[in-house]
Regions:
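Helix-to-loop junction immediately C-terminal to a conserved catalytic motif
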Residues: 8
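Catalytic Walker B motif of ABC-type/P-loop ATPase nucleotide-binding domains
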Residues: 116-120
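ABC ATPase nucleotide-binding domains
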Residues: 177-210
Length: 210
């Protein structure tokens, strides 16, 4: 979470710098969507699903101006992608945890970010919705890069393209694999990977100072 806040500019780094690159060239910033770990929305606040998703475009709207037709259309497209069309006019206080998660994800992608940052996105989503949630992320990943923080390694293992381990120091493993032994070290207990079909097998280089 701290690393994500540094990337987002919410916290200054103690040392080092954050650089953004686009097509191999350093750029001053990128369009970033963010889904925080904890849901800070007051569910008693009288706001609808559509209004929450629309709020993700607030930075694009000039002060005292209405949203354009194209922006409103974009909101409707996101509602469709999230499967929220039938809930668009419903107050957020009436939603389940999985439904609210989809609303917040919709808000984070409606601005069409170049990078989507998710902090423990399945922390308050029930298991029945989790599979569908990751299918949504796979679809979003076709248009946006995704940085996902999760302690649930088993869930994301088959989906991620690169792994970064953070324990005081950041260890980055591009295109790497994870072994059962590595998982066992991180969970402090023996781990056995079980799955149907092609099982992802990943082996990471040993971290220094471990």
């Amino acid at each position: 979470t701290t690393l994500l806040k540094v990337i987002l500019g919410l916290l200054p780094p103690v040392s080092g710098t954050i650089r953004f690159y686009e097509d191999g060239q350093m750029v001053p910033s990128l369009r970033i969507g963010y889904l925080p770990q904890l849901n800070n929305i007051d569910k008693k606040f009288p706001i609808s699903v559509r209004e929450v998703v629309t709020s993700g475009l607030a930075s694009e709207k000039p002060l005292f101006r209405s949203y354009s037709a194209s922006q409103k259309q974009r909101v409707e497209e996101v509602l469709g992608k999230m499967g929220l069309e039938d809930l668009a006019g419903r107050a957020i206080g009436e939603l389940s945890g999985g439904q609210l998660q989809r609303v917040l994800l919709g808000r984070s992608i409606v601005s069409r970010p170049q990078v989507l940052i998710l902090d423990e996105p399945n922390s308050y989503v029930d298991k029945r919705f989790e599979s569908h949630f990751y299918k949504l992320l796979d679809e979003i990943n076709k248009e946006s890069a995704i940085i996902l923080v999760s302690h649930d390694i088993g869930t994301v293992l088959a989906m991620v393209k690169n792994i970064a381990c953070v324990n005081e120091t950041l260890h980055y493993h591009p295109g790497a694999d994870v072994s059962e032994e590595w998982l066992g070290e991180k969970y402090a207990c023996p781990i056995e990977l079980i799955g149907h079909g092609d099982l992802p097998h990943r082996v990471l280089k040993k971290h220094e100072h471990e």
